[in-house]
């Protein structure tokens, strides 16, 4: 799917069902990675991967993310698509889209989707600051926190879609407390 012209993906009929999802926040220097539990309810941080200057199909950053996808036995990868508040795209969106295309080729047949990530880094920084993490202390984890926000947003939307019957297959989310 070419994301150069269309908006971000949304959970829907092509949902792969139960399984872990990986969330990715692509930056120009670092990539934040998060994972969900197998039931797709809660996103947690995994690691921060340095961006590689190599933009080839076997670049170290792409390889590391592909290894994480395999290690976690992910059924879906969600890459944040940064847009302005008006839904416009800039350089950061182009970087994320190109990265997603490269990753898609590496992890095929696992689907790689783009999710709206407006303000996730701002929200993550605010949450870290409110939890007492200094600005300097945020650097190593801000990308992971943004990846968690991207993935949690996807999981929450997926849960609403499942409950509304918009997601195909035999997808059933467990009730709270199970």
Curated annotation (Swiss-Prot):
GO terms of biological process kind: rRNA 5'-end processing
Subcellular location: Cytoplasm
Protein name per the record: Putative pre-16S rRNA nuclease
Gene3D superfamilies: YqgF/RNase H-like domain
This protein's record includes keyword Nucleus: no
InterPro entries named in the record: RNaseH-like_sf, YqgF, YqgF/RNaseH-like_dom, YqgF/RNaseH-like_dom_sf
HAMAP family per record: Nuclease_YqgF (MF_00651)
Domain of life: Bacteria
An annotated Gene Ontology molecular function: nuclease activity
One Gene Ontology cellular component: cytosol
Function: Could be a nuclease involved in processing of the 5'-end of pre-16S rRNA.
Biased composition (Basic and acidic residues): 1-18, 50-60
EC number: 3.1.-.-
Record organism: Rhodococcus opacus (strain B4)
Chief localisation class: cytoplasm
């Amino acid at each position: 799917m070419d994301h150069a012209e269309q908006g971000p993906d949304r959970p829907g009929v092509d949902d792969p069902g139960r399984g872990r999802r990986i969330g990715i926040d692509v930056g120009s220097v670092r990539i934040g990675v998060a994972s969900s539990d197998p039931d797709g309810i809660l996103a947690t941080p995994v690691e921060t991967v340095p961006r590689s200057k190599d933009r080839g199909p076997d670049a170290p950053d792409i390889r590391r993310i592909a290894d994480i996808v395999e290690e976690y036995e992910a059924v879906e990868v969600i890459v944040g698509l940064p847009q302005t508040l008006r839904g416009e795209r800039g350089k950061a969106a182009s970087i994320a889209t190109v990265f997603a295309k490269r990753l898609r080729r590496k992890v095929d047949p696992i689907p790689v989707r783009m999710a709206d990530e407006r303000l996730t880094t701002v929200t993550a920084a605010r949450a870290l600051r409110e939890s007492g993490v200094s600005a300097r202390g945020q650097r190593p984890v801000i990308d992971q926190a943004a990846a968690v926000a991207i993935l949690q947003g996807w999981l929450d939307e997926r849960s609403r879609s499942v409950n509304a019957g918009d997601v195909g297959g035999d997808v059933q989310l467990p009730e709270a407390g199970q």
